[in-house]
UniProtKB/Swiss-Prot annotation:
Residues 41-52, 351-366 have a biased composition (Polar residues). The gene is CSRNP3. This is Cysteine/serine-rich nuclear protein 3. Residues 335-349, 368-389 have a biased composition (Acidic residues). Belongs to the AXUD1 family. Binds to the consensus sequence 5'-AGAGTG-3' and has transcriptional activator activity. Plays a role in apoptosis.
Length: 585
């Protein structure tokens, strides 16, 4: 069998260099062997590593084949009858014997291929330039032009085309030729008569190839299915093409093949990912040391910053273990811009770090220059009180000219944080008109029996601080019903654990401003309780929201309202009461 397949060199011209056997493989120069893609240096073949991870691992072996020259056999063109072009006839073929032989070295052959490719590219660019000129003269074929019809390739010079800046790949030179070009090549090769019957045969072949697959729809009957009768499988590239059967309805005895686009897409994505991974690995190797140095420098620069933050938090707050308490921290947006001052830094810290409680209840003192704006704002709040009760706490006592709403933060901690000295926060108390309600023992089940002492602090015009004590008796809360007892039971106010509640009030000349809910998260679960403003309210219609904003007690305003005489009597009783809290000036 090997004798039959062996090529008979006797039929080839004896002058052909390929018919002679080389005396030695060492005659090939290193430069020529380096130009060949199939030659491998034996010294480096043992350490060969595949250039791409997509390639399969090959057996590392030495190759003793070296190429020293390239022999080219030239054949004349003939009508082929062997190929099926996309249109027309006049197929291209070659004669049975070559008419010439030429030998090249590896370098010479590469240069010859480059020259041929440049010639083909030049002809292609000249044809494109000619077609563009004809379209321009005829205005895209709408106008007839005699000058356009007389133009030929000879009229296009090399200066009109840009050959050097045109980049094409190897596949460009394997483009199919049109019918006219094929017929011209055959006549130039000496073919005098072109068989026209080939044209009809090729048309019939193309038509038969266009009609592929069976004509079945959904179901395939083996007796009528053309694929089954031909003994081939039904093929489905997309829905109903070329075969119209489904996977469940196909009864072809030969089987069925279905194109899976998801599988092809998955394979494509995996291949792209592998190539990207390989590319990233190659790029990361030279820059690995630089990245390590940048990371170390970045970590060293970030280290002291994190330490300073922890240090500032630790020094800004003093935490003492006391029974559980709830503290409300209030902070205005304007105080964020004044962190340079020590007093405002403490206020900012208590608002930012909600997990750490501060026993110094922060207050905002009113400014004399802002009294007119405060009065106008409080009047608007009283008008919208029925519609917007409990929506948000609006602080009317700002330290700046602009009045902004204040957020409220409810903080729970393991103990109540208290300062060692009240003199540290004396600046807050000196300029404040805040009411402080100290509940020493809140026992669930007895909310109607309130006998604690309360104190109200007002600032005298000359700068001294006076305390006006008063005692709140159970008669002052006539509508504190049983429903309120169950709402504020042991689940929210543990027994024997004191709590601090901060409520902001206005000045003596201002109307009562509704305070925000201290416990907004329990607003929907607790009943609404409202107390009448018996000290600050100028009229019987003014209300101060207590604890949770709106109240259902508003349906009985007659019971909550107090006359002017009762207010004066109550004020006298408050003066006679002993002072509970003393704040140093």
């Amino acid at each position: 069998m090997s004798g039959i397949l062996k090529r008979k060199f006797e039929e080839v011209d004896g002058s052909s260099p390929c018919s002679s056997v080389r005396e030695s493989d060492d005659e090939v120069s290193s430069s020529e062997s380096a130009d060949s893609g199939d030659s491998v240096n034996p010294s480096t073949s043992s350490h060969f590593t595949p250039s791409s991870i997509l390639k399969r691992e090959k057996r590392l072996r030495t190759k003793n084949v070296h190429f020293s020259c390239v022999t080219v056999y030239y054949f004349t063109r003939r009508q082929g009858f062997t190929s099926v072009p996309s249109q027309g006839g006049s197929t291209l073929g070659m004669s049975s014997r070559h008419n010439s032989v030429r030998q090249y070295t590896l370098g010479e052959f590469a240069r010859e291929q480059e020259r041929l490719h440049r010639e083909m590219l030049r002809e292609h660019l000249r044809e494109e330039k000619l077609n563009s000129l004809k379209l321009k003269m005829t205005k895209n074929g709408t106008v007839e032009s005699e000058e356009a019809s007389t133009l030929t390739l000879d009229d296009i010079s090399d200066d009109d085309i840009d050959l050097d800046n045109t980049e094409v790949d190897e596949y460009f030179f394997l483009q199919p030729l049109p019918t006219k070009k094929r017929r011209a090549l055959l006549r130039a090769s000496g073919v005098k008569k072109i068989d026209v019957e080939e044209k009809h045969e090729l048309r019939a072949i193309r038509l038969s190839r266009e009609d592929c697959g069976c004509d079945c729809r959904v179901f395939c009957d083996p007796d009528t299915c053309t694929c089954s009768l031909a003994g081939i499988k039904c093929q489905v590239d997309r829905m109903s093409f070329p075969c119209g059967c489904t996977k469940e309805g196909c009864s072809n005895t030969a089987g069925r093949i279905e194109f899976n686009p998801i599988r092809v897409r998955t394979h494509f994505l995996h291949t792209i990912m592998k190539l990207e991974l390989e590319k990233n690995r190659e790029q990361q190797i030279p820059t690995l040391n630089g990245c390590h140095s940048e990371i170390s420098a970045h970590s060293s620069s970030m280290g002291p910053v994190a330490h300073s933050v922890e240090y500032s938090i630790a020094d800004s707050f003093e935490i003492e273990t006391e029974p559980q308490a709830a503290v409300l921290h209030l902070q205005s947006a304007e105080e964020l811009d004044c962190q340079g001052e020590e007093e405002e830094e403490e206020e900012d810290g208590s608002s930012f770090c909600s997990g750490v409680t501060d026993s110094s209840t922060q207050s905002l003192a009113p400014s004399e220059s802002d009294e007119e704006e405060e009065e106008e704002e409080e009047e608007e709040e009283e008008e919208d009180d029925d519609d917007d009760k409990g929506d948000g706490f609006v602080e009317g006592l700002g330290t700046h000219a602009e009045v902004v709403p204040l957020p409220s933060v409810l903080c729970y901690s393991d103990g109540t944080a208290v300062h060692e000295s009240h003199a540290k926060n004396a600046s807050f108390y000196a300029n404040s008109s805040t009411l402080y309600y100290q509940i020493d023992s809140h026992i669930p089940g007895t909310p109607n029996q309130i006998s604690e002492n309360y104190s109200e602090r007002d600032t005298v015009k000359n700068g001294t601080l006076s305390l006006v004590p008063y005692t709140m008796t159970p008669e002052q809360f006539v509508d504190y019903a049983r429903q309120a007892e169950e709402a504020y039971g042991a689940s929210h106010y543990p027994a024997a654990n004191p709590s601090v509640i901060v409520c902001c009030s206005s000045s003596e000349n201002d109307s009562g401003v509704p305070c925000n809910s201290l416990y907004p998260e329990h607003r929907s679960n607790h009943p609404q309780v409202e107390f009448h403003s018996y000290l600050k309210g100028p009229s019987q219609e003014g209300f101060v929201s207590a604890l949770n904003g709106d109240s259902h007690i508003s349906e009985h305003p007659a019971e909550n309202s107090l006359s002017l005489a009762e207010k004066s009597i109550l004020h006298e009783e408050c003066i006679k009461s002993p002072v509970v809290e003393t704040v140093p000036v």
